Amino acid sequence: MVVGLGIDVASVERIRVALTRFGDRFWQRILTENEQADLATRPDRALALAGRFAAKEAAAKALGGQPDVWWHDVEIRPDSRGAPRLELLGSARAHAERLGVRRILVSISHDAGVAAAVVVLDGQ
């Protein structure tokens, strides 16, 4: 049973401008240390970050827009096949447990300068 659904889009150009303007501060504010390590070698950091940004926003929406869910409470890492895997940490994990979340599905796509993400929280 679906207990939460979120979708978000992010402009790759807006992320690129923020990276240029704020540098590593922007990168570090949005990404966990694990995510920073995963994306540091990507040739297009803005494209990669836009996808993660959209996925984190989609996860927050799937959780019901809780005000105490922060960027670092949602971590997106590649699985063994390279597909995105979303893990909830901190207050996001606590909210998911209260909702009865058993499985998290995430999809990230990029096209025409936009990154889009969908997150489904599956419960009992």
Give the positions of each predicted feature.
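Core catalytic alpha/beta fold that binds nucleotide/phospho-ligands
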Residues: 1-124
